[in-house]
Amino acid sequence: MGVFVKMATDSFNVGELALYRGLFAVVVLGVWVLCSHHSFATKHLKEHLLRSLCGTISFLLWFVSLTLIPLSTAMTLGNATPLCMAAIVVIYGLVKKRPTSLVLVCSAIAGFGGVLMIFSPDTNVNLVGAAFALGSSLVTAGSYIQIKALSRLKEPVWRTVFYFSIVNVILGAMLDFCLPETSLETSVGWRDILSLLGMGACGLAAQLCVTRAFDRSNMLVSTILSYSVIVFGILFGFIFFGDAIDLWMVAGTAVIIVTGVISTMSVKKLEEDPDSLL
């Protein structure tokens, strides 16, 4: 999806990207629900709205980062969510005066050390774009916590993704209205249309898969496999956009992946604690 978003940023603003991304999913899921006679109704609207707001804000931040930094960097920093979750759990433990895993603390610190390696002067990273990508990871951590909460409430995966997509459309349209320039003022070609369709299809498939994975509680396996996105991001960035592969970038990415896996293993142990944030 990141490749299609990166391609579309030349012709569409961030609001439009969020709008079209959500619209594709709303149409596809809406038709499926009507044909299969499922119900859109839910008893947990507040939980859906909170998850959808976190998810949409996360994507908006990530879309902005893609306009400022290379795809590989945006993928790496945008997938530092386990480190952000570790930081949240550590802070939560300190506030509640509860014992915190030393492994979790060390892995979080080391992971953010990997982030600093990516910020090395040799990598020439746009700090504003990197900040947006990291902000996306932080908000995504909150979104994942809400997905877990919805799974405990036995909400179906498709309904979680459907409400998320509706909020995509609403916030995207509002942001597009506030931004001065839209795609309607520029020439939109087949390449742009195909980019939007690719973004929508990949985005819908990814959301269904991620939500299903967390719904089945395979948090550790899901997180480890999700790091393959970073590898693909580096390769696709090099192939499609000519992004340079820097030694500091590779080293920092490796540190983030390793510490992210360790953080996830530590966080996984906390899920059994009834007083845990997770």
Question: Each predicted region: which residue ranges?
Answer:
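Transmembrane alpha-helices of multi-pass small-molecule transport proteins
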Residues: S11-I57, M85-I88, V139-S143, Y163-P180, ...
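Loop-to-transmembrane-helix transition segments
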Residues: H38-F63, V103, V128-S136, D176, ...
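C-terminal transmembrane-helix exit sites in multi-pass transporters
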Residues: P82-V103, V231-V250
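Hydrophobic transmembrane alpha-helices of multi-pass small-molecule transport proteins
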Residues: I88, T100-S120, W248-V267
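C-terminal-most transmembrane helix of multi-pass membrane proteins
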Residues: Y227-L278
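Helix-helix packing/entry segments at the starts of transmembrane helices
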Residues: A74-A80, E155-V167, L204-F238
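Transmembrane alpha-helical segments that form core, pore/gating elements
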Residues: V3-K6, L29, D122-E181, L277-L278
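Juxtamembrane C-cap of transmembrane helices in multi-pass membrane transport proteins
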Residues: M1-F12, L17-Y20, L60-L71, L77-A80, ...
